[in-house]
Amino acid sequence: MAKLTKKQKALQGKVDSTKLYAFADAVVLVKEAATAKFDESIDVAVQLGIDAKKSDQVVRGAVVLPNGTGKTTRVAVFAQGAKAEEAKAAGADVVGMDDLAAQVKAGDMPFDVVIAAPDAMRVVGTLGQILGPRGLMPNPKVGTVTPDVATAVKNAKAGQVQFRVDKAGIIHSTIGRRSFDNDKLQGNLVALIEALNKAKPATSKGLYLRKVAVSSTMGVGVRVDTQSISA
């Protein structure tokens, strides 16, 4: 574990772990603690009121953050014919079929998102053991297996993030960078929370959004009052 700087230790002492902070105040604290020389990611962790062990309570989906992620997303598309041309026109970085599969098998994967047209899944299906562990396997639940490859590419490039609850019932996601102003970060968080609410399992009982915490890549985490999260 990396050692905390004197400034981070001082800020850590200012954060009351038992207190819920308004989002605007939480972001101020998180940005003060983001002392790395690079533009740190601002991340959120959302504890959901679900039982992640039950298959009907697995929360998964995707949402386009209105203010982007601050990251350049490289997109690969498995498609052929007209769909391949549509993907290229939409800005895909790599487009192919068997040739792209061979590239993946060789370990050459300079991309962050993989999209597939439905008729390409016969090829993509053979790559599950490679793409799956890297979180790159296309899935219709997050819109990466779709006949509308052009829109999928545009969404990925525009700042779409995928989310999936972990075994502890927590969703982890970025909402931008330290360089983003607070309004942009809040707008992105609102979009994420709205997407999580839409993905709420029908079998989930009680309080759904239990805890929200915001942090930077190298900084301390601050708990957020969910009532303060609004557009």
Curated annotation (Swiss-Prot):
SUPFAM superfamilies: Ribosomal protein L1. Pfam families: Ribosomal_L1. One of its GO terms (biological process) is regulation of translation. GO terms for molecular function: rRNA binding; structural constituent of ribosome; tRNA binding. Keywords: Repressor, Ribonucleoprotein, Ribosomal protein, RNA-binding, rRNA-binding, Translation regulation, tRNA-binding. GO terms for cellular component: cytosolic large ribosomal subunit. It comes from the Bacteria. The keyword Repressor applies. Binds directly to 23S rRNA. The L1 stalk is quite mobile in the ribosome, and is involved in E site tRNA release. Protein L1 is also a translational repressor protein, it controls the translation of the L11 operon by binding to its mRNA. Part of the 50S ribosomal subunit. HAMAP family: Ribosomal_uL1_B (MF_01318_B). Belongs to the universal ribosomal protein uL1 family. NCBIfam families: rplA_bact. This is Large ribosomal subunit protein uL1. It comes from Paracidovorax citrulli (strain AAC00-1). The lineage of its organism: Bacteria, Pseudomonadati, Pseudomonadota, Betaproteobacteria, Burkholderiales.
